[in-house]
Amino acid sequence: MVSKIMNKKYEKGLSLIESAMVLALAATVTAGVMFYYQSASDSNKSQNAISEVMSATSAINGLYIGQTSYSGLDSTILLNTSAIPDNYKDTTNKKITNPFGGELNVGPANNNTAFGYYLTLTRLDKAACVSLATLNLGTSAKGYGVNISGENNITSFGNSADQAAKSTAITPAEAATACKNTDSTNKVTYFMK
């Protein structure tokens, strides 16, 4: 009788191997949750950036309707509208931020008629760059660019997104090649009519 009680006493609880298996399972579940959370967070940031671009475009088009040019267009004009959500307005530095921690820069074309104005999203990681570079703005867009400089001085649009402005929407394959910076220094530019 005493031995039965002792055996039951020793059978209670988990063995070391069982405890290790439970901890391993918990770690796997936690890692999976973190992975999917990060993926959902990145997707949400991309959607917010797209909404920000669309809102800025709509506001600019509304403000400049009937005007002959976009002369004087810059971020401070958009800061004074309701088109940009307050959490992306840096009124102290007169900048518009984007969901990835960079900026949304806007400006007119410099004395050329290749396009009307541009919008550039900066400090994008590779995944965000690919996602945002493939955004097709339809007939409102004159061209697209990835990691190009001197946006306001572009005078023509080519057929490739590699180091140049492109006249048509950027394909995912082109974006994967053009978004080459792995240190969150990519930028995507939309050239609007």
Swiss-Prot record:
Q: Name one GO cellular component term.
A: pilus
| Residue numbers bearing the N-methylleucine modification | L14
| Protein name, per record | Major structural subunit of bundle-forming pilus
On whether Calcium is a keyword of this UniProt record, the answer is no
Give the pro-peptide residues. 1-13
Q: What results from gene inactivation?
A: Deletion mutants cause significantly less diarrhea in volonteers.
Keyword Zinc attributed = no
Question: Which PROSITE patterns does this UniProt record tie to the protein?
Answer: PROKAR_NTER_METHYL
Q: Which cysteines are joined by disulfide bonds?
A: C129-C179
Instruction: Tell me the lineage of the source organism.
Output: Bacteria, Pseudomonadati, Pseudomonadota, Gammaproteobacteria, Enterobacterales
What keywords are annotated for this sequence in UniProt?
Disulfide bond, Fimbrium, Membrane, Methylation, Plasmid, Transmembrane, Transmembrane helix
Topology in the lipid bilayer is annotated as: Single-pass membrane protein
Q: Where in the cell is it found?
A: Fimbrium; Membrane
Q: What function is annotated for this protein?
A: Major component of type IV bundle-forming pili (BFP) that plays a role in adherence to host cells and virulence.
